[in-house]
Regions:
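Catalytic alpha/beta active-site cores
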Residues: 2-266, 270, 296, 307, ...
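Catalytic-core signal marking the mid-to-C-terminal active-site face
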Residues: 2-3, 367-481
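Short glycine/threonine-rich loop-to-helix capping motif typified by GTGT followed
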Residues: 223-229, 264-276, 318-331, 359-369, ...
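Conserved, mostly hydrophobic/aromatic
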Residues: 44, 107, 163, 281, ...
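Mobile "lid/hinge" segments at catalytic clefts and subdomain interfaces of large enzymes
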Residues: 206-240, 335-409
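Flexible, glycine/charged-enriched surface loops at secondary-structure junctions
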Residues: 34-37, 166, 245-256, 287-310, ...
Length: 481
């Protein structure tokens, strides 16, 4: 072995930042450096045209290690593995079961069932999950919010009846009290009462998450990245604050929260977003001094449980930028979005089929969506390297910049009284609506590029009967959830 490291490019003398700037200034021929080369992001910060090692000085992000608090570099130490999820809207439990068994043989290891509450009973669950090995696949369920406790009881009873090792089961129930307030301005029931009952009902399944932060809805509504993250943190903290005040231990609350983020096409900023999200959430949870629920080596200086500070993240490609026309271009968008989330170390991911905007996805579009993730795993090996972005001058600086912007927004929401108070006041909705309008205007003026729409559109396309699909809740209605 060599006694010393060989320096690459030793024949070339090093170039200082000053020399780079002199060259850039000369090439600009008098043009303003700030206007020409500095990117003023929608997130509220500026991005330089180049970064160097000196730009890492003072950044604490470079001290982070994979699998260690504050989890900036991911919650896993040995791999970048994530679960490939596909959604199934259950019209018939038998048909849904047949479809689930089929796609489990095609690369899926996480299922998401949208079930109708009015049909829920033990026989329904048995038919739906028949022959599906619950210890081998993550199972996620959505239903009307008023029936989540009933669903939890049915699942626990089913798994116990099947004699599963309950500690090997992973999944979630999509209870989210605040999402309806966000989209409809309506409240239904008592959040604390329902959440406590749900946590109690799901207690036999320690790795099932039942308190959801559906920041995906912000992303799909046109929120900027810093808004999505800042509001998501406040959203999660609202669960922590209200439920700990109601007597639920902080560690239990934290371990029942799941974050569902969207993924926009802003490639590098999305990588930075997920890294910043884990770091900020870990510090929020740590501030509650959660006590370990069992003997654990992963404790902080004050004995707080650092396992509870791990953010569980599901990511889904955005629908904000999916187009009705020239829809196959959506495949390009969702592919780069999936790459961002994979490199950032999410726990599970859904790639939305390219045709979802105008029809129920068919077998072809669903297969394409699955294979987009499988390509990243099996051909590109994105699941093998933990946080490959670590040490990148550019991404480390983006991570810090996004973290600062999101944290400022989080603090502003907390000063307003928390996420619940901000929703009641309409602050969150107004801010996201403004972003939506600004982004639509930017697309119309070609300041935000949407390939196939305002850049290289297909003028010869015959759209036929294409119409936007009208969204419905998981119960099949609009206001019954």
């Amino acid at each position: 072995m060599a006694d010393k490291k060989e320096k690459l490019f030793s024949d070339f003398s090093p170039v200082s930042t000053e020399q780079w700037m002199e060259k850039v200034t000369a090439d600009l021929k008098g043009a303003d450096f700030e206007k020409k080369l500095v990117w003023k992001t929608n997130e509220g910060f500026k991005v330089k045209p180049f970064y160097r090692m000196e730009d890492l000085e003072g950044l604490k992000t470079t001290d982070a290690l994979p699998g260690e608090f504050p989890y900036l570099r991911g919650t896993k130490k040995d791999s970048n593995e994530w679960l490939v999820r596909q959604e199934i809207k259950v019209e018939s439990p038998q048909e849904a079961n047949t479809k689930a068994l089929d796609i489990l043989n095609k690369g899926i290891d996480s299922l998401s069932f949208h079930v109708k509450a009015k049909e829920l009973n033990a026989a329904y669950i048995e038919t739906l999950l028949n022959d599906i090995c619950a210890e081998c696949v993550e199972l996620n369920f959505s239903t009307c919010q008023g029936h989540v406790v009933e669903l939890a009881n049915l699942l626990v009873a089913y798994f116990q009846k099947k004699d599963y090792d309950l500690k090997k089961l992973q999944g979630s129930i999509n209870f989210d009290y605040f999402n309806k307030m966000l989209s409809k301005g309506k409240e239904k029931g008592d959040m604390v009462q329902t959440a406590k009952a749900l946590i109690e009902a799901i207690q036999p399944l320690p790795f099932y998450r039942v308190l959801n932060v559906n920041a995906l809805s912000l992303n799909n509504a046109g929120a900027y990245i810093s808004q999505e993250l800042g509001y998501a943190l406040a959203w999660g903290n609202e669960y922590m604050s209200q439920l700990t005040e109601a007597g639920v231990p902080a560690a239990i609350v934290a371990k029942k929260i799941k974050f569902n983020f969207g993924i926009s096409s802003n490639y590098f900023l999305e990588i930075a977003k997920f890294r910043a999200a884990r770091m900020l959430w870990a510090n929020i949870v740590a501030s509650y001094n959660p006590e370990c629920l069992r003997d654990c080596d992963n404790k902080g200086a004050n004995g707080e449980c650092r396992c509870a500070a791990k953010m569980r993240v599901h990511a889904e490609t955005s629908t904000f930028n999916l187009t009705l026309f020239d829809a196959h271009v959506n495949l390009l968008r969702t592919q780069t979005e999936a790459m961002s989330a994979a490199l950032a170390g999410v726990d599970s991911m859904t790639v939305v089929p390219f045709d979802k905007t105008y029809e129920t996805p068919d077998e072809f579009s669903e297969r394409m969506a699955r294979n987009q993730q499988l390509l990243l795993k099996e051909e590109s090996h994105f699941d093998k390297v933990v946080d490959p972005a670590a040490g990148s001058y550019y991404i480390e600086n983006l991570t810090v910049s996004i973290a600062k912007q999101a944290w400022e927004l989080f603090l502003a929401v907390e000063e307003e009284g928390g996420f619940y108070a901000a929703l009641k006041a309409g602050t969150v909705q107004a801010a996201v609506n403004e972003s939506n309008k600004a982004r639509h205007k930017a697309v119309a003026q070609r300041r935000e590029i949407l390939l196939g729409t305002n850049q290289f559109p297909n003028f010869n396309e015959k759209a036929g009967e294409k119409k936007p699909v009208e969204a419905k809740c998981c119960c099949g209605g609009h206001d019954t959830c």
